[in-house]
Amino acid sequence: MNEPNTVAFGNLFAGIDANANEERFDTLVSRDGVLIERIVSTGQASPPGFWYDDAREEWVALLAGAATLEFEDTAEPPRRLLPGDYVRIPAHCRHRVSWTDPTVPSVWLAVYVGATPEEGDGEA
């Protein structure tokens, strides 16, 4: 699905295992400083004390399910996300997923822009 100059079709809701024990990350596009992923969560959350700290700007939309995001260094309270909600997270804005719905898969579309973790500091 990631071949340059090739038309690619897919369905963001295909191949979802509602009983998966681990989150699933599928790369849809990766080139020229842009990464687009489908993420499927089935009740997973960030471990206690863990914060994402990515060198890239992130834009995430929740397409199905429900989730709660927390931000470490902002006045923003934990934010419950429902289908159709999206958030833009600046580079190095420490955040975590504190909850995803265990009864229905949470399907995310994530777009990362900027240096890759190998080029920058990546995740903490």
Describe the function of each predicted region.
Residues 35, 68-70, 96, 107:
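General beta-strand recognition
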Residues 82, 91-118:
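Ligand-binding loop in jelly-roll beta-barrel domains
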Residues 1-51, 123-124:
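A short, N-terminal "cap"/entry segment at the start of jelly-roll beta-barrel domains
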Residues 53-54, 59-83, 98, 120:
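A short beta-strand-loop-beta hairpin characteristic of the jelly-roll/cupin
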